[in-house]
Swiss-Prot record:
UniProt name for this protein: Adenylosuccinate synthetase
Organism listed in the record: Clostridium botulinum (strain Loch Maree / Type A3)
Enzyme active site: D13, H41
Entry GO CC: cytoplasm
Record localization: Cytoplasm
Amino acid sequence: MSAFIVLGAQWGDEGKGKMTDYLAENADVVVRFQGGNNAGHTVVVGEKEYKLHLIPSGILYNDKLNVIGNGVVLDPKALFEEINYLESLGVEITPDRLIISDRAHVIMPYHRILDGIKERARGNKDIGTTGKGIGPSYTDKMERSGIRVCDLIHKEVFEENLKETLEVKNKIITEVFGGEALDYNEIYNEYLGYAEKLRPFVKDISVIVNKKIKDGKEVLFEGAQGTLLDIDYGTYPYVTSSSTIAGGVCIGAGVGPTAITNAVGIAKAYTTRVGKGPFPTELLDRTGDWVREKGHEFGVTTGRARRCGWLDLVILKTSARISGLTSFAVTKIDTLAGLDTLKVCTGYRLNGEIIDYVPASLEDLAKCKPIYEEFQGWDDSIANARCYKDLPENAIKYLKKIEDFTETKVSIVSVGPKRDQTMMISEI
């Protein structure tokens, strides 16, 4: 394997950061290909905990090249705050270890302002945005009015683009939403400062990444969010603004589809989601509360409590199909220890029919009634398990059901947040 993808197979928060960190040990390059600082990854190394939002998880190794791809929308302020945070924890970040695509689009102050204003204007029909300016930045990208990193570091180009764009944005902010206009000079001077700090990191990442692949280097593509937050295949409109599935790698990192050899879907042993939208297996009872507390299900970026539910195999089967997954990595199976009975969803009942896929219509998904298969749980903690045979028989049966239903093998099992609480049970 020379180029493989790690992506979320549910609604995000599956443990991609930990899995990327684990798999990055044998990689030469780690590439982030979409999203922005709305993502949150937690990685535990020894006694230290690192919270990452923009920078690839490979940064915690000294010998990896980390890449922020053109599919990412970059908030320079957030980037340098994260760099300062990591350096305060002893992580060295230099242009030899981190490069940023010259084609990545830049999140500007008006993107954050518009994100918040529009969300408030939706009232009780809000979509649960993080308010980081991600959606408005991707909107400008599609409308061909965005500012890219290569534009930002060219002073004259940036000056002209900012003048044109800010004039339009201020009209929208003031005349449509009744907000206060943003000051051109303030933004211009602030972002010129970012431009100079960014300049040493900026490269044509497609050229570099493809050369690494051609030279036989191990390249890991790190996704953010999850399959059901994908702009096309997610539970629209309660989705993110980028392509979170395997196909997003080609666009977001400038590589061809034939370069990808493997795709690993990260899945919790149960299901969670943040914000609004249908959730067929949601547990609105004491069991759901118990899972939330035991699994520490609160967002890294927002701090919001996550909604919790039984494992939904329909979602995993859909993710495997859409992204061509070669295997799953199952996380947080240790959280389920102590439950007498476990349920997994093996189908939906919709309008009198049984289906095994996620329907496009939000209204149809809201009507779907889960069909469950029950499994006996296990009492003992499995946090100290270090190989497959250490797992309880019932946990192995649970994992086998995932494989059989999705027709996709489970290659990795995680039983805790630390690096050594991870077992590779087959090739990915």
